[in-house]
A protein has these predicted regions:
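Glycine/tyrosine- and acidic-biased, solvent-exposed loop/turn segments at the edges of beta-strands
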Residues: 1-187
């Protein structure tokens, strides 16, 4: 194959619309699964996805970012149908490294690994309160501090998104109040 054209895979599961050179995809092209679950629009080099691209998923989400030698990696942006957006480092369309997630519920800024928060995270809520602490496998785990709108802060240990007692509330004037935390409380 040489030149511009549309190719359908032998099993009928995907199509490619773009340029061919010596039977290899080369230049701008569009590869789409017939099911609609995955559509890649971007450049090909020597039959591999390579360069800045847009990927549309069947659930309505859209990824924008680079591919290198047929692997998606580097800075990108993933926008979901509900308006939620993740911007930062990606690997295989998942946040991997430093990234920020923005939604109507607030902003999560932290370290991601294979699409999950793992490490230090700062969560800022629309009402101005914020949480700083550690996450493991997308859940709060370890010491975390909630900074409240009245100027006080609450320090607790978390296990799988559940506060562990005792917790300490520190008022704006520095008074420390130890208390038993209700389970799974969120701001």
């Amino acid at each position: 194959r040489d030149g511009q054209g549309v190719y359908t895979s032998g099993d009928g599961k995907w199509t490619f619309d773009g340029a061919w050179v010596n039977d290899k995809r080369q230049g701008q092209g569009k590869m789409a699964e017939v099911s609609g679950e995955y559509v890649y629009i971007g450049p090909y080099v020597n039959d591999q996805r390579h360069g800045p691209a847009v990927v549309q998923f069947g659930d309505g989400s859209v990824f924008r970012g680079p591919f290198v030698n047929d692997v998606q990696k580097g800075p990108g942006e993933l926008t979901f149908k509900d308006g939620r957006k993740i911007t930062g480092e990606f690997l295989d369309h998942m946040p991997n490294g430093q990234a920020v997630e923005q939604s109507t519920a607030g902003t999560l800024n932290g370290v991601w690994s294979n699409g999950m928060l793992n490490g230090k995270v700062l969560v800022t809520y629309p009402n101005g309160t914020r949480f700083e602490g550690m996450y493991a496998s997308n859940k709060r785990n370890g010491i975390g501090t909630d900074f409240l709108s009245d100027g006080s802060r609450e320090e607790c240990n978390w296990v799988n998104d559940v506060r562990q007692s005792p917790c300490v509330r520190i008022t704006p004037d520095g008074k420390r109040i130890e208390y038993k935390a209700p389970p799974a409380r969120r701001n």
